[in-house]
Amino acid sequence: MIRFSVLYPSTDGATFDHDYYRDKHVPLACATWGLDGAEIDKGVDGPYVAAVHFRFPSLEAFQAAMAAPGTADVTADVPNYTTITPVTQVAEVVSSP
């Protein structure tokens, strides 16, 4: 299992529209990549204002999703909800309850 996390660092003067992110952007990403859903975090206190975690069954599935033509549309949608440059992490899930 591969987890793809996108984190948005708290940045002075930056904007982030949580409603648009939850209602439009993340569903667009899920539909594009053929996923049933994702976990969305809204930062309360700490270094990130928001994060999302997508799960893929394998590294190959993740790589195929990133290479899909619709991924460009997902990336192009970012300015519609934030001025923050996100940080990403790709991780292998080694344990899950």
Task: Report residues per predicted region.
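Macromolecular interaction modules
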Residues: 1-97
